[in-house]
């Protein structure tokens, strides 16, 4: 009986010491055209994880980064997100810089019920229970700037410019309607 109690106590002690790690997926381009912007975000995540672990982790559990390189290739972002969630079994992902990379990852994150923190401004008009959009949307950035030009600077005419890309196209569509609602025509 004594051996049984001792063995049970040892098993309980071992189980209480076995703390599960929290795997943090880092989904930023380390190569290709976006590497110049996204490598810094990867480095920042690794620094923050190291600092948090030095303070005892999160709720007593160690944070373990799992870094992948989607290589500035939008379809590869989806594949790497799937890899992080299924092969590496991460608990959360931090990543993407561009709207198109986020939109590539979104169906995978929703299908596998993952969690993504998206770090930069975005065009709005998208909502998912699986994504924390941490950057400003047009109603938090572009609209207040437009109001400033209208109210403080007295600007009466606007020309909406941007590259042929998701963020500027969508933001300009929102701004065009906003200006139209205020009775201001947008130049062609």
Question: For each predicted feature, which ranges?
Answer:
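Extracytoplasmic ligand/sensor domains, especially the bilobed periplasmic-binding protein
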Residues: 89-188
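Generic structural signal for well-ordered alpha-helical scaffold segments
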Residues: 53, 82-85, 146-150
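Short, polar/charged alpha-helical segment
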Residues: 37-59, 174-181
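Short beta-strand segments enriched in small/hydrophobic residues
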Residues: 21-40, 96-97, 157-161
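Gram-negative bacterial Sec-dependent N-terminal signal peptides
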Residues: 1-19
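Beta-alpha junction/loop-to-helix N-cap segments that form part of ligand/metal-binding clefts
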Residues: 36-43, 56-125
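Residue-level signal for short, function-critical loop segments
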Residues: 30, 71, 164
């Amino acid at each position: 009986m004594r051996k049984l109690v001792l063995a049970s106590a040892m098993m309980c002690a071992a189980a209480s010491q076995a703390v599960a790690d929290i795997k943090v997926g880092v989904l930023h381009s380390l190569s290709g055209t976006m590497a110049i912007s996204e490598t810094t975000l990867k480095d920042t995540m690794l620094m923050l994880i190291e600092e948090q672990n030095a303070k005892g982790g999160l709720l007593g559990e160690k944070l373990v980064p799992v870094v992948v390189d989607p290589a500035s290739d939008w379809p590869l972002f989806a594949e790497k997100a799937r890899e992080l969630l299924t092969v590496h079994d991460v608990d959360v992902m931090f990543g993407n810089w561009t709207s198109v990379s986020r939109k590539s990852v979104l169906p995978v994150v929703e299908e596998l019920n993952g969690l993504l923190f998206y770090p930069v401004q975005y065009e709005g008009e998208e909502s998912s229970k699986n994504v924390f959009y941490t950057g400003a949307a047009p109603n938090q950035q572009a609209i207040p700037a437009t109001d400033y030009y209208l109210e403080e600077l007295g600007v009466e005419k606007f020309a909406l410019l941007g590259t042929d890309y998701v963020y500027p196209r969508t933001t300009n569509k929102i701004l065009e309607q906003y200006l139209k609602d205020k009775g201001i025509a947008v130049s062609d």
